[in-house]
A protein has these predicted regions:
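PLP-dependent amino-acid enzyme catalytic core
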Residues: 1-326
Length: 326
């Protein structure tokens, strides 16, 4: 299914104060410090998702249209009607982040960006580096020093300038911001930029194309929450254009020790303790997601839920998955 090249007129709107402004990859935060969302100027009845980019083909690496597999063993184990997994790991760079990277780098290309700074826990950095290479851009990717070597090597293979930063994930963000200011380079943050989340909407359309309106629940691992936000926005469009009648419940899964979204939804006070927080789920080890409120709103409006899991549980279910599968 080719869902490319369908754009609409749009503007930025602050999710905190409601201020509207002209869209630009150079605009990451409002004067009130809130993050922007993309709002389209006209309602669309078209089948395709409304997108802020006209030409995806120029940077297309094969992102999207990932397969889904059924797991009868899990259906029996959990006593549920159906259990499916969407295999985002076969995306060009190995993660769902390619959906957002394609949109963000295309937007940057439209504004003649030649060099930029980004930070990541690994997956987004590799993805952004891949699309930057395709676009002929010079990228500086900041990642924690403890990032798995395979991700560091992957970023290097794409030709990016990699910066290894000591300390927790947030330290890489701070270092990237300081570097961009010092060197007068754009900070092209996938966590702050609304373009990145927008690219995730294709995920919803692909599920609808495969299952129509039969999916009742979608479980998503959440660090910054771009996939969950994009999934929610995609389903909003599908409902508005009368292609489906009901939105699936969106469920957020966080790593224990990095669960600010779950904690807030449960009314619990959560304070990040870097000396006592580590997880094998490095891709979602995010202590300060900039779009936390947007993630929570998306979960609530879909009647979903949020939980956190510890490393012991993650390891246990990895083994159980292999046992049930094979």
């Amino acid at each position: 299914m080719n869902l490319k090249n369908h754009s609409n007129k749009f503007h930025f709107k602050c999710l905190e104060c409601g201020k509207e402004t002209e869209p630009s990859v150079f605009s990451l935060k409002c004067d009130c410090n809130g993050v922007f969302d993309i709002v389209y100027d006209e309602f669309s009845q078209q089948y395709f998702p409304r997108m802020p980019i006209e030409n995806f083909d120029r940077l297309y690496l094969g992102e999207g249209n990932t397969p889904v597999l059924s797991f009868p063993e899990f259906e029996k184990f959990f006593d549920i009607k159906s259990f499916w997994m969407k295999l985002e790991n076969i995306s060009p760079s190995g993660s769902f982040k390619d959906r957002g990277s394609a949109t963000l780098i295309n937007a940057a290309l439209n504004e003649s960006v030649l060099e930029f700074v980004e930070d990541s826990s690994g997956n987004a950095g590799a993805s952004i580096a891949a699309y930057a290479a395709k676009a002929g851009m010079n990228s500086h990717i900041f990642v924690p020093k403890k990032t798995p070597q395979v991700k560091i090597d992957q970023i290097k293979v794409y030709g990016s300038n990699i910066h290894l930063i000591e300390g927790p994930r947030q330290s890489s963000t701070i270092a990237a911001q300081e570097f961009s200011k010092k060197n007068n380079l754009i900070y092209l943050s996938h966590n702050y930029s609304p373009y990145f989340c927008e690219g995730m909407k294709y995920f919803s359309y692909e599920i609808k194309e495969t299952f129509n309106n039969d999916i009742t629940d979608i479980v998503i691992p959440v660090g910054n929450g771009s996939l969950l936000i994009g999934c929610f926005k995609g389903y909003q469009e599908l409902i508005e254009s009368s292609q489906i009648k009901k939105m699936p419940k969106l469920h957020c899964v966080q790593a224990e020790g990095f669960n600010p979204i779950e904690s807030e939804m449960k009314g619990e006070k959560w304070i990040f303790n870097p000396s006592d927080s580590s997880t094998i789920a490095g891709g979602i080890a995010v202590s300060e997601p900039p779009r936390k409120n947007q993630v929570i709103q998306s979960i609530l409006e879909s009647n979903g839920s949020a939980i956190s899991v510890n490393d012991e549980s993650i390891s246990k279910w990895h083994k159980k998955f292999n046992f049930l599968r094979f």
